[in-house]
């Protein structure tokens, strides 16, 4: 075999059987760009969702605040309308009550009277001071309004008068209860009652506070003693003056009687008519 033919066969054997493809660089860049666009779209969607949620919450808060403001700022006309609606409701209940029994009617009237009395008492002492905290109801605070109806009662501890907090409110309580209790002083058991009552009222005070109260009572006792002594002296003087006047009258009467006897003896003797 000649050398030229050998070279040709060697070149044919070393030639590639299939063509070599170029790397798909362009395709990879396109895919990366698409993925970046998708991520950006997701981020934008998340941001939009957050903004919508914030806007929704802000709108709800604003609506709630406006509703509360409207509820707290009712006009006079609105309040009147509400009261009229309440009256209409009560009238409707009264019309429905036409079919109620006599016992049910008495019970309804009793309940309405009790509510009316309580409302009247609260209105009477309105502004004195109201406590929002409801205390446990004690049996001693329940007062029977109607002696014939044991169920017709009222809890006086709920009245504003008995929940004072300021000096003025305590003064009002004193001026209200003082005359009511003081008018019982002529009764025979009043002194013992007042002793026990004062002791009960002051039992939770400190010793120095009780001493102040005792000093006030001592001063009152001294004033009363002076008044009683002055009245006693005045009575003695009046009695002595009255006794002196009576004695003087008796003395003058004796002199007149004596003169009358002398006149009868001297001027009109029995011998003068002989």
Curated annotation (Swiss-Prot):
Coiled coil: 46-112
Region (Disordered): 1-120, 227-246
Record field: compositional bias (Basic and acidic residues): 51-67, 79-92, 103-120
GO terms, biological process: formation of cytoplasmic translation initiation complex
InterPro entries: eIF3-like_dom_sf, eIF3j
Gene Ontology molecular-function annotations: translation initiation factor activity
Superkingdom of the organism of origin: Eukaryota
Location (main, coarse): cytoplasm
One Pfam family hit: eIF3_subunit
UniProt keyword terms in alphabetical order: Coiled coil, Cytoplasm, Initiation factor, Protein biosynthesis
Cellular location(s): Cytoplasm
Record's compositionally biased regions (Acidic residues): 30-50, 93-102
GO cellular component, one term: eukaryotic 43S preinitiation complex
Subunit description: Component of the eukaryotic translation initiation factor 3 (eIF-3) complex.
Role of this protein: Component of the eukaryotic translation initiation factor 3 (eIF-3) complex, which is involved in protein synthesis of a specialized repertoire of mRNAs and, together with other initiation factors, stimulates binding of mRNA and methionyl-tRNAi to the 40S ribosome. The eIF-3 complex specifically targets and initiates translation of a subset of mRNAs involved in cell proliferation.
Protein family (similarity comment): Belongs to the eIF-3 subunit J family.
Protein name: Eukaryotic translation initiation factor 3 subunit J
């Amino acid at each position: 075999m000649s050398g030229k033919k050998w070279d040709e066969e060697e070149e044919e054997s070393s030639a590639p059987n299939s063509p070599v493809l170029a790397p798909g660089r362009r395709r990879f860049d396109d895919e990366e760009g698409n993925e970046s666009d998708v991520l950006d779209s997701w981020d934008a969607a998340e941001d939009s969702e957050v903004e919508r949620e914030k806007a929704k919450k802000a709108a709800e808060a604003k609506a709630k605040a406006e509703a509360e403001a409207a509820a707290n700022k009712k006009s006079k006309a609105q309040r009147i309308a509400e009261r009229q609606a309440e009256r209409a409701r009560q009238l409707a209940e009264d019309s429905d009550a036409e079919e109620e029994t006599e016992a049910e009617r008495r019970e309804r009237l009793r309940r309405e009277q009790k509510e009316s009395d309580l409302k009247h008492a609260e209105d009477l002492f309105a502004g004195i001071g109201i406590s929002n905290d409801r205390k446990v109801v004690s049996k001693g605070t329940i007062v029977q309004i109607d002696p014939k109806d044991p169920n017709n009662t009222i809890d006086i501890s709920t009245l504003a008068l008995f929940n004072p907090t300021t000096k003025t409110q305590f003064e009002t309580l004193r001026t209200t209860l003082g005359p009511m209790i003081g008018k019982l002083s002529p009764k025979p058991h009043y002194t013992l009652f007042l002793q026990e009552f004062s002791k009960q009222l002051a039992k939770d005070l400190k010793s120095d506070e009780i001493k102040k109260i005792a000093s006030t009572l001592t001063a009152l006792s001294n004033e009363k003693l002076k008044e009683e002594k002055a009245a006693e002296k005045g009575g003695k003087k009046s009695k002595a003056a009255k006794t002196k006047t009576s004695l003087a009258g008796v003395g003058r009467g004796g002199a007149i009687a004596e003169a009358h006897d002398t006149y009868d003896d001297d001027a009109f003797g029995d011998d003068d008519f002989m």
